[in-house]
């Protein structure tokens, strides 16, 4: 008789492990969404800078390691924009903004994709929670049957 109860407990334990794995997956996806949103914010800042800075303006240029140097913009007519894959291209201000806007659109698509993944994980979670509830009800019924048999 204890085999039936133990099997149910094992099923519950397996379901709990699957639920934990799904929760971790959901958290990882949410973290990736935050990273993508941060990247979008950086793009917005770059677009704003391109649109507002003028030749002769003084800016702080990051050197890395939280070190900056003051620099004077000599020419806002040409902006270097990364294209991906380690490549960059020189564009006029308008072309640079267009390039950055396309990057943002790609990131929007990625966010939609990730939100779809979260939806799938949530559906799987709901399904597992339903299975857990059913397994728990089965365990309760088995326990009640064992108690009735003992009486």
UniProtKB/Swiss-Prot annotation:
Role according to the record: Molecular chaperone capable of stabilizing a range of proteins. Seems to fulfill an ATP-independent, HSP70-like function in archaeal de novo protein folding.
An example GO biological process term is: protein folding
GO CC annotation: cytoplasm; prefoldin complex
Q: What would be the name of the gene that encodes this protein?
A: pfdA
Quote one Gene Ontology molecular function term.
unfolded protein binding
- Tell me which Gene3D superfamilies the record gives: 1.10.287.370
Give the similarity note. Answer: Belongs to the prefoldin subunit alpha family.
Compartments annotated for it: namely: Cytoplasm
> How is the subunit organization of this protein annotated in UniProt?
Heterohexamer of two alpha and four beta subunits.
Q: What HAMAP family does the database record attribute to this sequence?
A: PfdA
Pfam families per the record? Prefoldin (PF02996)
In terms of one coarse class, where is the protein primarily found?
Answer: cytoplasm
Q: Which domain of life is it from?
A: Archaea
Q: Disulphide bridges in this chain?
A: none
Segments of this protein annotated with the region Disordered: 120-151
Composition bias type Low complexity, residue spans: 133-151
Sorted alphabetically, the keyword list is: Chaperone, Cytoplasm
For this entry, the protein name equals Prefoldin subunit alpha
The answer to whether keyword Cytoplasm applies is: yes
């Amino acid at each position: 008789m204890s085999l039936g109860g133990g099997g149910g407990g094992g099923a519950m334990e397996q379901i709990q492990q699957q639920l934990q794995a799904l929760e971790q997956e959901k958290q990882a996806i949410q973290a990736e969404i935050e990273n993508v949103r941060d990247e979008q914010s950086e793009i917005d800042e770059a677009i704003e800078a391109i649109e507002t800075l003028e030749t002769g303006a003084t800016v702080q240029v990051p050197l890395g390691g939280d070190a900056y140097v003051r620099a004077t913009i000599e020419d806002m007519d040409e902006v270097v924009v990364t294209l991906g894959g380690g490549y960059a291209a020189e564009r006029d201000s308008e072309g640079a903004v267009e390039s950055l806007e396309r990057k943002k659109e790609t990131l929007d698509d990625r966010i939609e994709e990730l939100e779809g993944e979260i939806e799938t994980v949530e559906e799987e979670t709901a399904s597992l929670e339903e299975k857990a509830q059913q397994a728990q009800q089965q365990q309760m019924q088995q326990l009640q049957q064992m108690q009735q048999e003992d009486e």
